[in-house]
């Protein structure tokens, strides 16, 4: 009984009601093994008959439209549209500041669209850092509430900023005379 290849049901009702225990792939029986499930069981019959049906017209149209959409690659069109719209977008970090830091990093004569994209990426990075710092301040309860209002104001401290910058892989070095 312990040998999986020698498993045989003890009675004829067991072969109809219970499937054999799950076996690893290398213990699987050959394809000519007797059928365990009854041919009268409706759920098995329904599954078998529905497996080999051809697709309906609506299903074929859906598959065709899906293939066309995948082949068009709309994300590439969206990317080109986004890059072209960068010229109309006034960045928070001015182009002159971005160009200065690009030149100091050794990048010369970059495309204005690339400059805008780098400016936008820097803005996103800074906003993520500040959002994380504010979330940390809220979790620590460092806000101040005035008596007349219910608004809580949070102050961004260097200690909070140091924690968040370490998470992002930046090191905030303070001058020795800083208190």
Curated annotation (Swiss-Prot):
Disruption phenotype: RNAi-mediated knockdown causes arrested development at 90-100 cells and inhibits differentiation. The two E cell daughters (E2 cells), which form the endoderm, divide abnormally early, immediately after the MS2 cells. Phosphorylation of the RNA Pol II large subunit C-terminal domain (CTD) is reduced slightly in embryos. Abolishes expression of taf-9, perhaps as a result of altered protein stability. Reduces expression of a range of genes, including let-858, rps-5, hsp16.2, and pes-10, but has little or no effect on expression of cki-2 and sur-5.
Region Disordered, annotated ranges: 1-23
Chain ranges passing through the membrane: none
A cellular-component GO term for this protein: transcription factor TFIID complex
Keywords: Nucleus, Transcription, Transcription regulation
Subunit structure: Component of the TFIID basal transcription factor complex, composed of TATA-box-binding protein tbp-1, and a number of TBP-associated factors (TAFs).
Classification lineage: Eukaryota, Metazoa, Ecdysozoa, Nematoda, Chromadorea
Protein name as catalogued: Transcription initiation factor TFIID subunit 10
Gene: taf-10
